[in-house]
C-alpha cells in the first residue's frame, strides 16, 4: 500500500489549452511507485484528447467522471479519493506544482505524524502564486533550483516572480482518507472552481483542530491573504500553513488567464 495517494482533477477546453499541457507535464514528471500513487481524474471536458493513454502509459491511474455535464473540481476529488489505495490523500490542482524534494518531505511527515492511523492529523501547504513572467523564466533553470529561486524571491520581497503568498492552500491538504470520506468530501453542488475548498476546509478544521482563540466574524471574506487583524475565515484558515513553511515545504501556483 502506498504512503500517499495524490488526486489530480482536470477538465479540458479549447479556450484553456494550457490545462492539457500541464496534465501532460505532470504525468511525465511524476513517478507512481510503492510510496506514492498519482490519480488523474477527468471531469467534464469540451475538447477531445488522448490523455488517458499517456497517463496510463506512465503508470498512473486515470479515472473519468462520465456523468459530469459541467466541470466540477469537487466531484473529481471525491471520485479520486474513493479509488485511492493509500489511507492518506493529497489533492493537487493541475495549476499547482510541488517539487520532488518537497514530496519526499511530505512522505516523511506522513509517517512521523502517523496520518494513516491518526484521523485528526493534517498537513496544510502554503502556496506561492506566481506571475506570468515566472512561467517562462523558471524553465531557464534546472528544476532542482526552483524551490530556492522562488523562496528567495518571496523572502527578500523582490517579487520578481511572486504575485502573492497565501499562508494556507485550502484545496491542497494532506488528510486521512477515512476522515475525508467521513466528513462527506467536497460538496458536489459547487460547479467549476470556487469556494468548494473553503467549505470543506472549514469542516476539516472544526472536526480535527482545537483553537484557543477564533477570529471575529467568521463569515467575513477579506478577499486576500494580507491580514491586519484577526477577522474572517481566511485569517482562521491561514493558521495551519505555517508549520509546513518551517519545514521549507511550499506549493507553487503557476499563472493562467483568469
For the regions a protein language model found, what residue spans apply to each?
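C-terminal catalytic/acceptor-binding lobe
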Residues: 20, 192, 196-258
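Glycine-rich, basic loop-to-helix element that forms the pyrophosphate-binding segment
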Residues: 67-84
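Short beta-strand-to-loop element that shapes/binds the nucleotide-sugar donor at the catalytic cleft/hinge
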Residues: 119-140
Amino acid at each position: 500500500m502506498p504512503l500517499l495517494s495524490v488526486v489530480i482533477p482536470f477538465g479540458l477546453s479549447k479556450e484553456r489549452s494550457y490545462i492539457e499541457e500541464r496534465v501532460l507535464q505532470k504525468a511525465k514528471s511524476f513517478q507512481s511507485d510503492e510510496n506514492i500513487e498519482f490519480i488523474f481524474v477527468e471531469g467534464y471536458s469540451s475538447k477531445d484528447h488522448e490523455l488517458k493513454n499517456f497517463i496510463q502509459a506512465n503508470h498512473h491511474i486515470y479515472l473519468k467522471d462520465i456523468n459530469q455535464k459541467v466541470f466540477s473540481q469537487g466531484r473529481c476529488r471525491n471520485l479520486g479519493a474513493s479509488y485511492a489505495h493509500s489511507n492518506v490523500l493529497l489533492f493537487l490542482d493541475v495549476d499547482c506544482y510541488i517539487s520532488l524534494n518537497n514530496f519526499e518531505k511530505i512522505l516523511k511527515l506522513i509517517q512521523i505524524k502517523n496520518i494513516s492511523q491518526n484521523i485528526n492529523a493534517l498537513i496544510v501547504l502554503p502556496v506561492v502564486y506566481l506571475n506570468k513572467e515566472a512561467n517562462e523564466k523558471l524553465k531557464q533553470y534546472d528544476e532542482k533550483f526552483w524551490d530556492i529561486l522562488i523562496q528567495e524571491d518571496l523572502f527578500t520581497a523582490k517579487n520578481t516572480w511572486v504575485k502573492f503568498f497565501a499562508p494556507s492552500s485550502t484545496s491542497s491538504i494532506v488528510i486521512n482518507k477515512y476522515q475525508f470520506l467521513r466528513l462527506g468530501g467536497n460538496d458536489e453542488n459547487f460547479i467549476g472552481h470556487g469556494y468548494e475548498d473553503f467549505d470543506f476546509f472549514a469542516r476539516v478544521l472544526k472536526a480535527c483542530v482545537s483553537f484557543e482563540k477564533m477570529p471575529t466574524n467568521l463569515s467575513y471574506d477579506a478577499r486576500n491573504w494580507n491580514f491586519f487583524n484577526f477577522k474572517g475565515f481566511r485569517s482562521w484558515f491561514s493558521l495551519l500553513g505555517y508549520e509546513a513553511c518551517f519545514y521549507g515545504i511550499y506549493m507553487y501556483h503557476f499563472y493562467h488567464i483568469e
